[in-house]
Amino acid sequence: MVQRKSQDGKTVMVEQIGSPIRNSRIQHATLKGLGLNKMRRRRILKDTLCVRGMIAKVRHLVRVIDEG
């Protein structure tokens, strides 16, 4: 299995724009894993494949604000 490492300075800022109410427990847990649990809360995360996968699972609940 080949693992790709992120660039040292790469980060991504995400903001929660949707409520996890009426969504599955898995999506609620994914938001929690991203550090998001309230509306309009923002987090700066390392830009890794794992984080990108989590964002993709809840793309209807979050917005990517800044990639840098």
From Swiss-Prot:
This is Large ribosomal subunit protein uL30. The keyword Lyase does not apply. CDD domains: Ribosomal_L30. One of its GO terms (molecular function) is structural constituent of ribosome. Belongs to the universal ribosomal protein uL30 family. GO terms for biological process: translation. It comes from the Bacteria. Keywords: Ribonucleoprotein, Ribosomal protein. The gene is rpmD. HAMAP family: Ribosomal_uL30_B. Part of the 50S ribosomal subunit. GO terms for cellular component: large ribosomal subunit. The lineage of its organism: Bacteria, Pseudomonadati, Pseudomonadota, Alphaproteobacteria, Hyphomicrobiales. The keyword S-adenosyl-L-methionine does not apply. InterPro entries: Ribo_uL30_ferredoxin-like_sf (IPR036919), Ribosomal_uL30_bac-type (IPR005996), Ribosomal_uL30_ferredoxin-like (IPR016082). It comes from Bartonella quintana (strain Toulouse).
